[in-house]
Amino acid sequence: MLPLASNAEENSSSEGSDVSRLTAYSDPARIWGSGVERVIEEAYRLCFHTRILGGKVMNLRMPFAQDNERNKLTGEDWGFLGGGKGNPAFLWERINQVLDSDDFRLYTETLSDGKEKVIIFDLPTQTWSVTRDLFEIARMKAGSYRGLLHRPYVLVSGRGLEETDVYNYLYCVGQAGMDCSGFVWHIQSRIAAAGGVDLGRTLARTLGAKHGEDPSWYAGTNFYNAKSSQIIPVKDEICNLRPGDILLFRAEDGRMAHSAVIQSVDFFSGIIRYLQCTDEAPLAERGVHESFIRFDPQNTAVSLSDPSLVWTQNRYRPFPGEKPSPFSDDGKRYRAYPEQGGGRVVRLRAVSQAIGKMK
């Protein structure tokens, strides 16, 4: 029996070595070093979760949590868990409960029966139904979309569950995720914490949070555009940009409608990597995802509004058949509404100070 024990010990040691190697390989510091880029990458990775669903290994991304953009026809509000401002650990706990539910199991079975069908989601009631009507299926294939903002229609093949199907369910039924500013707050909070700063406590009064309230609930995109000593305007020339800076995209009425955060600026290769949470993206990227801007390394005095820059992130309708975004890519969205000021870049003073401490 002694040789068997020895073999078991060797196997255990080998498995431990494999785990150690995988851990070292996946360490963000391997690529991003030990500075703020690594901290942002770690915070970004917290927004992904691996599950086995429908017999497949799936790397799920944190869904987008719309902020009542879809209640225009219903006149009633329904709330995403945490108002779109929850931290990843809190949200993944709820998401796992949803994915372990009997209703999601039935949803998976329905999408795996080998038959084409249309799934009809209803956001106000957090339910779904199915029709196998051939005329309805033909309408969907022909591009005749009958869905509404609060009742998305989705054509499925019946050949099994895909990651996009999981997203649809979590968005419409689970209603757990992050909105754009909630994701930015998550990143900013992690940066601040790495520098020894409690961002919520530091900005609670500025945000208008009352005692005992979660300050993150008040950190909407308009806060990042506020005239406050805690908000540092940044001239949006590439040479001025730093990891942790916040990109703001303006709406037609002059308010800021979307926010994202810069993770890295590679002045050698001419690439800006920024992170965001939105559903106006390719189906497989809806939710939290990375995006890029390409620039000429020899010309870093150029503004982000300059059309010579290449913004690689294309924008799509959240559900096939819905009205498309008026902007085909993030660059056009950033440059939009110049009469209102267009896009802009800011940084949080408390986060900037925390980054200084990290250095």
Q: What are these regions, as identified by a protein language model?
A:
Residues 16-198, 355:
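N-terminal capping segments
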Residues 2-5:
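Hydrophobic h-region of N-terminal signal peptides that target proteins for export
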Residues 277-284, 288-359:
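Low-complexity, Gly/Ser/Thr/Pro-rich intrinsically disordered linker/tail segments
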Residues 55, 113-116, 125-126, 229, ...:
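Intrinsic-disorder/low-complexity loop/linker signature
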Residues 197-287:
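...with weaker cross-activation on analogous glycine-rich loops/strands in unrelated enzymes
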Residues 189-194, 264-267, 318:
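Short regulatory "switch" loops immediately downstream of catalytic or recognition motifs
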